[in-house]
Swiss-Prot record:
This is Probable protein kinase DDB_G0277539. ATP binds at I514, G515, E516, G517, S518, F519, G520, H521, V522, K537. Its EC number is 2.7.11.1. GO terms for cellular component: cytoplasm; nucleus. Residues 1-34, 65-207, 265-284, 316-367, 380-420, 435-489 are annotated as: Disordered. It comes from Dictyostelium discoideum. One of its GO terms (molecular function) is ATP binding. It is an enzyme of class 2 (transferase). InterPro entries: CC_SR_Kinase, Kinase-like_dom_sf, Prot_kinase_dom, Protein_kinase_ATP_BS, Ser/Thr_kinase_AS. Residues 140-150 have a biased composition (Basic residues). The keyword ATP-binding applies.
């Protein structure tokens, strides 16, 4: 073909190639049509008559087909005037002129958007479209048709250059159901001014496009703002970008997610007549009939009707206006791998592809954390894969009043981490507290927030929604509630993003503050799932560095290494949260024993020895692991007890309530006990608040008196009489745990319980330091007075001296209550020389610790047990004596019987043997008579000798038989047939006389 000359080319305004273009596979024919002819840049009439491109012809054919289709529908349906007036869709379709020509708008870089405020303008401007087209072509820089996949571009240097893929509601996107939808680029300041001018003067002939609001300003936008969201998820984010205006005629079913069929969502859009939305269209159209048939059929009348649900509502709601058509520049459908994105758009493709040009970037959209969950649920319920197409319908509608009420009511139920405190914590029925609760009625404090009221409110709001949604089914209304419940978190997205997830608050219910120390706070908590009680340590200050973290983690390492022991506080879990370390441990319901000192609760010697025995058992286990505690003191020794009904202290002829052991509940279980002198049968449990102050005061006086004179083997805790044998003492607070062979100590313990060698940095005997600390603890409990932190008394304790003379009257009274063996035991434990101090194993073998203080009852019990042992031994001796007598009688009978063996061939040998046997028997009898005390041993020896003799006799007998056999053999050879009979007397044991054949 003939290409135009250089002079002719000046008439044509060619497209400047910049980085903002998107090219296809054949860039050489971008400036040519199907006939390889250069596209002329004249007005639209000239281009129509001379050089019409293939796509322009297709557009005109499609519009004609659509017009014919509409005329057929009007003739078949013939709606009334009232129906037409009530339907904005019919009005728009009837008033639109057959403008099937794409045109350029003057000074516009984006494609018109048909929103809620543009429907009226569409009808007014339809008559002026042709005039605008003819007048503006001369001013436009690009009036030729492009075949390649390029975006709209303006070469004007005065305005910013960007791809103008806008959201269009006026284009015929129902014919291109598979065209990906692109988002418009951010509007410049110049475009925003044009938008304001357009809103002020709507009667001008210049049709300007309102630019969309960026994503960052969506929350502050007006009713014309656009929601930039993917198509499959715009209903999920409806409440996130919810506007303030309320339309009573709007359907809440826009927010529905139908679990059974995704097509119900599209049907809801067809029923929504007043939902005027900003529709997002693609600026690219198909280039061939094959690409138009997205549903697998060729371009015909049937294919136009077979449109997807997302595009079908464009014709029904009147947003499709034939007057607002594309500009004269040809646009093509962008493939999924060539999709263009601007700065405020993001891809929903599972495998994102690179952008078509270097200047177009895909920003990482920071979606909320719950977005993938809702997306996945919606896709799983509909059994559909995530679509790679961007044909999205962004919902910019305002919810009605009923929907807003639902949001407010549901926000009270689901506030994320803020509502954790209202969750119900279970009570384990297998624990002691659970058993007590099964007997008693639940306490009012356990009746936490009930969600029935909120559910009723939700049902009432659901009824309101049914009244407002006249065009929807009841099933869709049920979906409203489910979707609203899912979107409540999106309504409070700011609070959820600010409030961090707390494992401590989510897993445990905080009940009380147990204690506070240098480490931090210790809380009594209940696990929300298993219902058990735990003690959780939390660092007081946030960890500032690795050094602080290492110091705190030493206790965690120690607890995890020790695992589980009866006399050591059990460790469960540890975690770090907000620069705080949390340690979950076993809850000890009796607290620590330091309150014995502060409250002057005196303990007997037997109780302290029982305490020392259990603590030494735990120390032995720690030392067996090659570790040392280095912080043994009353504050770190805890009590676990079990309270039974028989252990409750009561007063005669009084009726009062006493607190049972509460394993960490908010309030103790109350019980009324009516007692007599010998009766505790009438036990009535109640949960009402008790106001028996007078009875409690009288009872407390008795408790104090019993505690101050606690010489018996029991302990009074919370009004309960606890037997010391049922109490378990545990070692806790392993923050200073260290290796026994380590010469470096990170921190020292309490100076009141430190040994002298540790004060002088002597780390050679760290195990003996624990013994010194335990000795100081027993000394403090015996005195019932706190140890000094400095002074002469402090120094005397380091020297192993107990200064009895300098003590006050309280200590003098305690001195007489303990034995000298007890004080000697304490002195040995606090000896200044660590090599002299006994080890933990040796102390467990000490008689005073092993057996404790023996009382009169213990002596009587011991005597009874000894008598029983003696009686059993006497019975055994009598039986043995009777057996010995029977054996002696049998032997005498055997000796009295004659034991002669007559052998004619060897008479002399037999006589000698008989004499020897007779002599041995006589000797045996003489020895037996002389040694009556050793009858058993001598009898055994005589039996052994007798057996030896019998064996010798048997051997001789065998030899004799062999000789006889030889003689018989010789006699047979000599043919001498005679027999000799030899009669011999057998021994007394063999059973008498035997005849032998020779």
């Amino acid at each position: 073909m003939d290409f135009p000359s250089q002079s002719e080319k000046k008439k044509y305004i060619t497209k400047k190639r910049t980085t903002l273009f998107s090219y296809d596979d054949d860039d050489d024919d971008d400036d040519f049509d199907q006939n390889r002819e250069f596209i002329h840049m004249s007005s639209y009439e000239e281009s129509k008559d001379q050089q019409n491109s293939f796509n322009t012809l297709l557009l005109s054919e499609l519009s004609n087909c659509e017009d014919q289709k509409q005329q057929q529908q009007q003739q078949s349906s013939s709606p009334t005037q009232s129906d037409c007036d009530s339907s904005p869709t019919n009005n728009n379709n009837n008033n639109n002129t057959n403008n099937n020509i794409v045109h350029h708008l003057n000074n516009s870089n984006s494609i018109p958007i048909s929103g809620s405020n543009n429907n009226n303008n569409n009808n007014n401007n339809n008559n002026n479209n042709n005039n605008n087209n003819n007048n503006n072509n001369n001013n436009s820089h690009h009036h030729h048709l492009r075949k390649g996949r390029r975006l709209f571009h303006d070469d004007n240097d005065d305005q910013p250059i960007y791809p103008a893929s806008a959201s269009l509601s006026s284009t015929k996107t129902n014919m291109f159901p598979s065209s990906p939808i692109l988002y418009s680029s951010p509007s410049s300041q110049q475009q925003q001014q044009q938008q304001q001018q357009q809103s002020q003067s709507q009667q001008t002939n210049e049709f300007k496009v309102p630019s969309f609001t960026p994503l960052s300003f969506i929350n502050n936008s007006s009713t014309n703002s656009m929601n930039i969201r993917p198509i499959n998820n715009n209903r999920i984010y409806n409440n996130l970008n919810n506007n303030n205006n309320n339309n009573n005629n709007n359907n809440n079913n826009i927010n529905n997610i139908n679990n059974n069929n995704i097509n119900n969502i599209n049907n809801n859009y067809n029923n929504n007549n007043n939902n005027e939305e900003d529709q997002i269209f693609s600026s690219s159209l198909p280039t061939s009939p094959v690409s138009w048939s997205a549903n697998g059929s060729m371009m015909n009348g049937h294919n136009i009707n077979n449109i997807t649900g997302n595009h079908s509502r464009f014709l029904s709601n009147g947003s499709y206006n034939k007057g607002n058509t594309f500009p004269s520049t040809e646009v093509k459908r962008v493939r999924p791998d060539q999709r263009a994105f601007n700065e405020n758009s993001f891809s929903m493709s599972p495998t994102p592809s690179p952008p078509p040009t270097p200047s177009l970037k895909r920003n990482n959209y920071s979606s909320p954390k719950f977005e993938p969950v809702f997306i996945r649920l919606a896709e799983e319920r509909t059994n559909r894969k995530r679509s790679t197409s961007m044909t999205s319908n962004v919902n910019n509608n305002n919810n009605n009043n009923a929907n807003n009420n639902n949001v407010n009511n549901n926000n009270n139920n689901n506030n994320g981490p803020n509502s954790i405190s209202s969750l119900i914590a279970n009570v384990n029925p297998f624990t002691e507290e659970g058993r007590l609760q099964s007997l008693n009625k639940p306490c009012p404090s356990f009746q936490l927030v009930n969600n029935n009221n909120n559910n009723n409110n939700a049902s009432n709001n659901n009824n309101d929604n049914n009244n407002n949604n006249n065009n929807n089914n009841n099933n869709n209304n049920n979906n409203d509630d489910t979707c609203n419940n899912n979107n409540n978190n999106s309504q409070n997205i700011d609070n959820n993003l600010i409030t961090k997830f707390s494992l401590y608050k989510h897993t445990f219910q905080e009940l009380d503050l147990i204690g506070e120390g240098s480490f931090g706070h210790v809380y009594k908590v209940r696990h929300r799932i298993d219902g058990c009680l735990y003690a959780i340590k939390k660092t007081k200050k946030p960890l500032k560095g690795q050094k602080d973290r290492d110091i705190v983690l030493r206790e965690v390492y120690g607890l995890s290494a020790i695992k589980d022991h009866t006399n050591i506080v059990r460790y469960f879990n540890a975690w770090e949260e907000d620069s705080h370390i949390f340690i979950q441990m076993e809850h000890c319901n009796g607290g620590n024993i330091y309150k014995w000192v502060t409250e002057h609760i005196k303990q007997s010697e037997s109780n302290l020895l029982l305490l020392a025995k259990q603590i030494l058992t735990g120390i032995v286990y720690i030392h067996s692991l090659g570790l040392v505690h280095l912080d043994i003191k009353p504050e770190n020794i805890y009590i676990i007890y079990k309270c039974n009904q028989n252990q409750i202290i009561t007063n005669n002829n009084n009726t009062c309530s006493i607190n049972n052991s509460s394993n960490g509940s908010d309030s103790y279980f109350k019980s009324k006990i009516k007692t007599t002198e010998n009766d505790l049968d009438n036990f009535i449990t109640t949960t009402n608040s008790v106001n028996n102050n007078n009875c409690n005061n009288n009872n407390n006086n008795n408790v104090d008196n019993q505690n101050n004179n606690n010489q018996n083997n029991y302990l009074i805790i919370d009004g309960n009489k606890i037997n010391f044998n049922s109490i378990t003492f545990k070692i806790g607070d392993l923050g200073l745990l260290n290796e026994a062979t380590n010469t470096k100590i990170y921190s020292e313990g309490d100076s009141r319980y430190l040994s002298r060698e540790l004060l002088h940095d002597d780390m050679s005997a760290l195990k003996k330091s624990d013994i010194f600390s335990l000795g100081c603890t027993l000394y403090e409990l015996a005195r019932c007075k706190p140890l000094p932190k400095s002074g002469m008394e402090w120094d005397s304790i380091r020297n192993g001296i107990l200064s009895f003379e300098k003590e006050d009257s309280i200590y003098d009274d305690n001195k007489n209550d303990f034995s000298t063996e007890f004080w000697q035991l304490i002195k040995s434990m606090i000896h200044p020389d660590p090599s002299v101090r006994p080890s933990a194993e040796q102390l467990l073998e000490h008689p005073l610790i092993k057996y404790g203080v023996i009382e009169i009852d213990d002596f009587e019990n011991e005597i009874e047990t000894l008598k029983n042992l003696l009686a059993e031994k006497e019975k055994v001796l009598i039986i043995q004596k009777e057996k010995q007598k029977l054996r002696q009688n049998q032997l005498q009978q055997k000796m009295q019987q004659p034991n002669f063996i007559e052998l004619k061939q060897q008479p002399q040998q037999q006589q000698e043997k008989q004499q020897m046997l007779h002599q041995q028997k006589q000797q045996y009898l003489e020895q037996h008579n002389n040694n009556n005390d050793n009858n058993n041993n001598e009898f055994d020896e005589s039996e052994k000798e007798y057996q030896i003799q019998l064996e010798q006799f048997k051997i001789q007998k065998m030899q004799f038989q062999l000789q006889q056999e030889q003689l018989q053999y010789q006699h047979q050879h000599k043919h001498q047939n005679f027999f000799t009979k030899q009669i011999c007397t057998a021994s007394q044991i063999e059973g008498g006389i035997k005849n032998m054949a020779l």
